Design a protein with these regions (language model features):
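Extended, folded cores of ATP/NTP-driven motor/assembly subunits in large transport
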Residues: 1-230, 234, 239
């Protein structure tokens, strides 16, 4: 019996065009800057500090131009703890601590922030508003160098506001940290392999089905929280 399921190549569906000067350029000419985020330790933030963090996010987002997208991703990957072996001699307490948690399951957490500059046309794209009707392939706005320069300036302001808050640290990712090198896996490679390891990962089959997403033998569980539905700090405190 012939298999009627259609298989797509990752190369054909891959949405990224290139990474230049630490900026991700999509095939739709969207411009994205990526950050690694360092958050406060769990249960260490008071109510007033949480309010201040919330205000910092709002203040930082207001400096971004129109048609910008702010995407904060929290990756939680279930792993088993492995003792650190850096070659240094460990004390009795340190060695006992490492052995106590050896091979215990835990959630490895990593947080990333993506700031994207898109266009008005992307938000109103329809089947009758294709490139065949427009007469040009890329939006005129995105080909304007001044538009890109203004966006990057606003990104720097965003980073400065968040770092000055004293609770959250943003570190902009360089090109090699996004694309990877021969020795170290980049963000894209980690994303496609569901791994936080710095060593180069082996890419596996990606299965996308209704109600199920899987990469190799790893399953995905996704939760999306939109800004206009996100609870305020006071709502979280009262719940």
């Amino acid at each position: 019996m012939r298999n009627v399921l259609k298989a797509e190549t990752l190369e054909r569906r891959f949405p990224l065009l290139s990474v230049e000067n630490g900026c991700i350029v999509s095939k739709d000419a969207d411009l994205t800057v990526a950050f690694e985020v360092e958050l406060p330790e769990l249960y260490t933030v008071t109510e007033d500090e949480y309010e201040a963090m919330h205000s910092s996010w709002i203040k930082a987002m207001k400096v971004l131009p129109e048609h910008s997208i702010v995407c904060k991703q929290d990756w939680f990957i279930q792993e088993t703890y492995r003792p650190k072996s850096d070659g240094e001699e460990q004390s009795f307490l340190t060695r006992s601590y490492e052995l106590h948690f050896n091979e215990r399951p835990y959630l490895n957490h990593r947080c990333y922030l993506f700031l994207t500059k898109t266009t008005r046309e992307r938000s109103r794209r329809r089947s009758d508003f294709s490139t065949l009707c427009r007469g040009f392939l890329l939006p005129r706005e995105i080909t304007d160098k001044d538009t890109a320069a203004r966006f990057l300036e606003s990104v720097e302001q965003f980073e400065r506001i968040m770092n000055d808050s004293g609770h959250i640290r943003l570190r902009r990712l360089e090109t090699d940290e996004i694309t990877g090198t021969e020795e170290r896996a980049g963000l894209v490679e980690k994303y496609l392999s569901l791994s936080l390891e710095d060593e180069s990962a082996v890419l596996q089959d990606i299965c996308l089905k209704p109600g199920r997403m899987r990469i190799g033998d790893k399953r995905l569980c996704l939760h999306t929280c939109l800004l206009y539905t996100s609870p305020s700090p006071r709502d979280v405190e009262e719940s």
